[in-house]
UniProtKB/Swiss-Prot annotation:
Expressed by the venom gland. It comes from Lachesana tarabaevi. It comes from the Eukaryota. It is found in: Secreted. GO terms for molecular function: toxin activity. Residues 1-20 form the signal peptide. Keywords: Antibiotic, Antimicrobial, Cytolysis, Hemolysis, Secreted, Signal, Toxin. This is M-zodatoxin-Lt8c. Belongs to the cationic peptide 06 (cytoinsectotoxin) family.
Amino acid sequence: MKYFVVALALVAAFACIAESKPAESEHELAEVEEENELADLEDAVWLEHLADLSDLEEARGFFGNTWKKIKGKADKIMLKKAVKIMVKKEGISKEEAQAKVDAMSKKQIRLYVLKYYGKKALQKASEKL
């Protein structure tokens, strides 16, 4: 259970990184530099900071691809977990559970699995108290 929560947190972190807005490119920075003529030292520092953001674009590309792979694997795992939960919870055959899960969207599958594990974690926490 602990590993599942840690994996879920990592997936959420990668999602935030992958969906962040793109940084300004070096070409756009050159245009800003020409327009503003950099009279102030503070402006020079600001533009220098923005020039470093081009490295972030490369990192975001790496994490974006990694995020897609992780998300795909997480979806497959959640699909399998949803089938197991339905078999255990509803007492139906594996084929019937698979048919029900196939009819659900990815979002519904995620919510179903997270709801199940959330209730399970809440029960364990209340037992310890």
